């Protein structure tokens, strides 16, 4: 068994007993990256020297007995999360050479624990997309089938964990950007409650929807990482003050009597038959574990996708106004005057999808259309929140498929924005309502992974993890991606 194939909790056992060093673990992952990265293109930056230095520091920490649950564990960070002294590009020409002078709060927390950063992962430019094909630098491939997408926008992070390039990764989720790629790559991905994890240092896309979360190899690892990254941060005005629970205490196999809601809206038109069957089998597994399955309805969820694309694009058009070539980022070389410089800089720096969203958002916010689009979308947002609140009166968690399909072919939806946007049809409502959600692998359809999404009430991550863990232990999903030469 190679070190790179182990989970966080397995590596911690070995590190604690001094059976391996953090340096050995790090070298194992760096070798793995050299082996599989040319095939999957998951990373935009590899920080080998920095990682080896941090590994030596972690070993010193362990020697002194100052280690914690994540000391000596290697991570990959999505490239829209700021890392001091390490390029943070958002996979955009606009920020191709941008090196932040500070760390995001989540990165600071991980470094304090002695975590080792191996590199930064590829994403859809500025996190806008569902396939990681919108990156200005490269197209990440799915380790299960190199002709297919890994999902997006955090496709690089998901592919990296599926291919064992790190023990865990961080991503961001605005409308499904952690859960959907986790589903397509057969790993665990969690979007915490909005405000639970600090967004300070996350390059903003849609500030009322964005949330940072982990990709891991199993549910136990997810709980371990969550313990570290949550917490109030005065630098983020939307960060919430709540008591910090120990999420590992929720990892129990007992879910007897737990009420699980199944919304009919999550099994509607557009879902692949194989995905539907796999998720229905998963519901049966949970029923056999003693959970009570309750049919529920979330009527306004059918309007979630259009509402999301209006709200997210409106916020993006405002957030991305800062990229004008004046203070940092790309600046045009040839221009006639200040206005022309803005126009040329932004035309050169932004890709097609980012321009599309900025135009959509600016249109929705314009004086003649504000009431018809943006204001209406905010009303729909409230209706969706109310629907979830009503549903949670009848059940403790809600489950369904994470994505309506398995991973699709690279290029298949590139010229059809609507088909691409539909990839997030089951995930956007969770962001709109600010709820926590997790995707866990539940089986295969045509040899490709299917994700089960578990949604909870605000701050009920513990219950979600309980259900996810119980299911994982009963289901024992053990398939591994073979397209990269049989990872793990």
From Swiss-Prot:
Reaction it catalyzes: L-glutamyl-tRNA(Gln) + L-glutamine + ATP + H2O = L-glutaminyl-tRNA(Gln) + L-glutamate + ADP + phosphate + H(+)
Record-linked InterPro entries: Amidase (IPR000120), Amidase_CS (IPR020556), Amidase_dom (IPR023631), AS_sf (IPR036928), GatA (IPR004412)
EC class of the enzyme, as a word: ligase
Domain of life: Bacteria
Disulphide bonds in the chain: none
Gene Ontology molecular function, alphabetical: ATP binding; glutaminyl-tRNA synthase (glutamine-hydrolyzing) activity
Annotated EC: 6.3.5.7
Keywords: ATP-binding, Ligase, Nucleotide-binding, Protein biosynthesis
Regions that span the bilayer: none
Annotated GO CC locations: glutamyl-tRNA(Gln) amidotransferase complex
Keyword Repeat set for record: no
Active site feature: 78, 153, 177
Keyword Ligase: yes
A Gene Ontology biological process term: translation
Biological role: Allows the formation of correctly charged Gln-tRNA(Gln) through the transamidation of misacylated Glu-tRNA(Gln) in organisms which lack glutaminyl-tRNA synthetase. The reaction takes place in the presence of glutamine and ATP through an activated gamma-phospho-Glu-tRNA(Gln).
Family note: Belongs to the amidase family. GatA subfamily.
NCBIfam families referenced in this protein's UniProt entry, alphabetically: gatA
Subunit comment: Heterotrimer of A, B and C subunits.
Protein name: Glutamyl-tRNA(Gln) amidotransferase subunit A
Species this chain originates from: Thermoanaerobacter sp. (strain X514)
């Amino acid at each position: 068994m190679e070190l790179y194939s182990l989970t966080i909790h397995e590596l911690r056992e070995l590190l604690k007993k001094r059976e391996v060093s953090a340096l050995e673990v790090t070298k194992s992952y760096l070798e793995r990256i050299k082996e599989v990265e040319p095939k999957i293109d998951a990373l935009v930056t590899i920080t080998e020297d920095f990682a080896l230095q941090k590994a030596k520091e972690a070993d010193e920490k362990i020697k002194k007995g100052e280690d914690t649950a994540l000391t000596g564990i290697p991570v990959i960070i999505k490239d829209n999360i700021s890392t001091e002294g390490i390029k943070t590009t958002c996979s955009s020409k606009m920020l191709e050479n941008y090196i932040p002078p500070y760390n995001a709060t989540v990165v600071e927390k991980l470094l304090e624990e002695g975590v080792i950063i191996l590199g930064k992962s590829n994403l859809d430019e500025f996190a806008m997309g569902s396939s990681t094909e919108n990156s200005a630098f490269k197209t990440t491939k799915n380790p299960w089938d190199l002709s297919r997408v890994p999902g997006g926008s955090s496709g690089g992070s998901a592919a990296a964990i599926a291919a064992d390039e790190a023990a865990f990764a961080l991503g961001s989720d605005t409308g499904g950007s952690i859960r959907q790629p986790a589903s397509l790559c057969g790993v665990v991905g969690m979007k915490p409650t909005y405000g639970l994890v600090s967004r300070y240092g996350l390059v903003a896309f849609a500030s009322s929807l964005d949330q940072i979360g982990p990709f891991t190899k199993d549910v136990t690892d997810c709980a371990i990482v969550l313990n570290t990254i949550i917490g109030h941060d005065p630098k983020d005005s939307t960060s919430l003050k709540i008591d910090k629970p120990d999420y590992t205490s929720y990892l129990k196999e007992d879910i007897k009597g737990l009420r699980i809601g199944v919304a009919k809206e999550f099994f509607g038109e557009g879902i692949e038959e194989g995905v539907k069957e796999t998720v229905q089998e998963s519901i049966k597994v949970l029923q056999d574990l003693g959970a009570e399955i309750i049919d529920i309805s979330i009527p306004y969820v059918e309007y979630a996708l259009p509402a999301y694309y209006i709200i997210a694009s409106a916020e993006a058009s405002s957030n991305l106004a800062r990229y004008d070539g004046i203070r940092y980022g790309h600046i045009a070389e040839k221009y006639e005057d200040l206005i022309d410089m803005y126009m040329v800089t932004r035309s050169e720096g932004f890709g097609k999808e980012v321009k599309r969203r900025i135009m959509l958002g600016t249109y929705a916010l314009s004086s003649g259309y504000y009431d018809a689009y943006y204001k209406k979308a905010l009303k729909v947002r409230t209706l969706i929140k109310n629907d979830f609140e009503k549903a949670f009166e009848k059940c403790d968690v809600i489950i369904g498929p994470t994505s309506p399909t398995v991973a699709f072919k690279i290029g298949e939806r590139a010229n059809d924005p609507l088909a691409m946007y539909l990839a997030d049809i089951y995930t956007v409502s969770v962001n709109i309502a600010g709820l926590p959600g997790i995707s866990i692998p539940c089986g295969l359809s045509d040899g490709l992974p299917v994700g089960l999404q578990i949604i909870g009430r605000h701050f009920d991550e513990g219950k979600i993890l309980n259900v996810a863990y119980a299911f994982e232990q009963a289901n024992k999903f053990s398939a591994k991606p073979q397209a990269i030469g049989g990872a793990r």
